[in-house]
Amino acid sequence: DCSEIKDAAEVSTALFWLFLAVALVGVVLNVLLIAFFVVAATSASPTFRAVRYLNPTFCILIAVGCIIALVALPLLGLNTAVASEGTMDGMCKAYPWLLSVAWALVFSCTAAKDVKLIIIFAKAQKFQRVTVSNLEMLRVVAPCLIIFIVFNILWIAIDPLELEWEEKDATTKYYVCKSDHTLVWAGVLYGLCAALILVSALCALRNWWIPSYLSETKVICAVVYNTVLVTCVVIPLYYVFEEEASLRFVLVGP
């Protein structure tokens, strides 16, 4: 019980508010980006012709994924000074959902955009004209989302996450969000995320030769490279410093 804790090793309240403020700025920027793509997608003006080549619908979905991640990451730093134990427990259960759905949206949509280019240029080489509708592109996104949703449902049903307080020493406790087999479930989730980002990277590499003004391939490859690099460093450190709440939050938050 939180009321019995003499000293809680929690994320610093100042650090939480700082990261929340940064996340809110990111959310506002993504909302503005969504508004821009909505205008571009619905406008008949030739000014937005180049933007329409970028598939505004899927750019919007990517921005939505980013917003979900931006909302989820600061909430990982909730502590007893800013939230009740019930709220923290709810966030504990929601966190895998939010991050996995955000990940699935971002990288399945980037893969879908590249798959569209692969199909178009493959047909063009045979002198065939082809159009790929948004509905056809959603056939790439939907299975990815379904896989992650089914996984999270199984995790909740079989081995639900709980917020627990563990002793750091005789007078200090820290809270952890875990289940009986957290490492197994987290390992599978990381594996699914790695598989999705690998597919996204392979699709982008297939389009490497396409000029930058027709494709975001090089940008996608840079995003994938940076994501993999940061993840490979952050995830091991996150589990090594289990008792250092603020340090773990700084590692994951950015």
State what each model feature region is.
Residues 2-254:
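Alpha-helical multi-pass membrane domain signature
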